[in-house]
Amino acid sequence: MDRLLVLVRHGQSDWNLKNLFTGWKDPDLTEKGIGEAQAAGRGLKAKGLAFDIAFTSALTRAQHTLKLILGELGTPDVPTTREQALNERDYGDLSGLNKDDARQKWGEEQVHVWRRSYDISPPGGESLKDTVARVLPYYCQSILPAVLDGKKTIVAAHGNSLRALVMVLDGLTPETIPSMELETGVPLIYRLRANSTVESKEVLKLG
């Protein structure tokens, strides 16, 4: 049985381009982001991959990325679940702020701690640990059972919500996961064993 799970971070958004903390705010993709999502779809198609089921967040940039990928695959009607549990980390009071302006206001070191520590949250927001605590139960209850049932599964989400999944799949620690970068629009192709551990992982090279 092929237990396929593909993870993809959304393409570049308007606020990525403007260097803003985005979190639960809802900007759409830039032209570059649209191109990244389409390239991801073409790359998956070139590998002969198709999907039985899809999951994405409640935010436009992830939903748009998924729609473009499925369009390139010629399968726009794949059953799709849109779930708030897969949303990006909530940056609280940082949301909508330019990252350089935030560094000027709070200091470079403090902003770095908020962005790259595991369990320290910005004012009014979530830590990465908080994000993991809402993403992983949803993965275990809804996504993983589909994969283990042999349904070819794609998840289009966000840098931090996907970090939570990669942390479990790759066996990373709370110390190492915050510094791991996920490129926009680049699929991670996993195949799982029946016990849910990873049999193989491929980062799909595009272009």
UniProtKB/Swiss-Prot annotation:
Q: Give the E.C. number(s).
A: 5.4.2.11
Q: Where is this site: Transition state stabilizer?
A: 158
Q: Gene3D superfamilies under this entry? A: Phosphoglycerate mutase-like (3.40.50.1240)
* Catalytic residue list: 10 (tele-phosphohistidine intermediate), 88 (proton donor/acceptor)
Alphabetical keyword list: Gluconeogenesis, Glycolysis, Isomerase
The record's section on InterPro entries has: His_Pase_superF_clade-1 (IPR013078), His_PPase_superfam (IPR029033), PG/BPGM_mutase_AS (IPR001345), Phosphogly_mut1 (IPR005952)
- Does this entry carry the keyword Cell division? no
- Pfam families in the cross-refs: His_Phos_1 (PF00300)
What reactions does this protein catalyze?
Answer: (2R)-2-phosphoglycerate = (2R)-3-phosphoglycerate
Where on this chain does substrate bind?
A: 9-16, 22-23, 61, 88-91, 99, 115-116, 159-160
Protein's UniProt keywords contain Isomerase: yes
Tree of life domain: Bacteria
The record's subunit annotation is: Homodimer.
Q: What does this protein do?
A: Catalyzes the interconversion of 2-phosphoglycerate and 3-phosphoglycerate.
Question: What's the protein here called?
Answer: 2,3-bisphosphoglycerate-dependent phosphoglycerate mutase
User: Which lineage is the organism of this entry classified under, starting from the top rank?
Assistant: Bacteria, Pseudomonadati, Pseudomonadota, Alphaproteobacteria, Hyphomicrobiales
